[in-house]
Amino acid sequence: MLEPKDTKHRKVQRNQGLKRNKYAVKGTRLSFGDYGLKSLEEGEVNSRQLEAARVAINRYLKRDGKVWIRVFPDKPKTKTPAETRMGKGKGEPEHFVAPVQPGNVIFEVGGGADEESAREALRLGKHKLPLKTKFVVRPGSRAEE
């Protein structure tokens, strides 16, 4: 599963400020493949969900195409044990999540995959994610012709 090798701080503070941008500014265009899965809502995707979606996409594509994961789970989520009294500090890091904003590309497919198989592979992968997503095609690619 995906997680950072080493972090400067084990735990992160919660974001208390207002969101400056409602939609993603970076990571909104396809960079590697001809087809992609773009987020339509804000949320967090953990490393297990990303891995499950990647496996589902790769199983369908077999060796016909290549898959790129465009988000990385680098934000630690902490949890205190059940039935613990108040105080005693913040809990231990449990898993890592990738914050996703509307417009972020989560997966890309290319490298010889045709549109029909890429669409079906990404459809299978999107069912593993907790966000609404849509299928996108790179403008000006051979897929649009």
Curated annotation (Swiss-Prot):
InterPro entries: Ribosomal_uL16, Ribosomal_uL16_bact-type, Ribosomal_uL16_CS, Ribosomal_uL16_dom, Ribosomal_uL16_sf
NCBIfam families on file: rplP_bact
Designated name of the protein: Large ribosomal subunit protein uL16
Subunit structure: Part of the 50S ribosomal subunit.
GO-annotated cellular components: cytosolic large ribosomal subunit
Domain of life: Bacteria
PROSITE patterns, sorted: RIBOSOMAL_L16_1 (PS00586), RIBOSOMAL_L16_2 (PS00701)
Cited PANTHER family: 50S/60S RIBOSOMAL PROTEIN L16, LARGE RIBOSOMAL SUBUNIT PROTEIN UL16M
Skewed-composition ranges (Basic and acidic residues): 76-95
Pfam families assigned to the protein according to its UniProt record, in alphabetical order: Ribosomal_L16 (PF00252)
Keywords recorded for this protein, A-Z: Ribonucleoprotein, Ribosomal protein, RNA-binding, rRNA-binding, tRNA-binding
Entry's family note: Belongs to the universal ribosomal protein uL16 family.
UniProt-listed SUPFAM superfamilies: Ribosomal protein L16p/L10e
GO molecular function: rRNA binding; structural constituent of ribosome; tRNA binding
Region annotation (Disordered) ranges: 76-97
Its job: Binds 23S rRNA and is also seen to make contacts with the A and possibly P site tRNAs.
One GO biological process term: translation
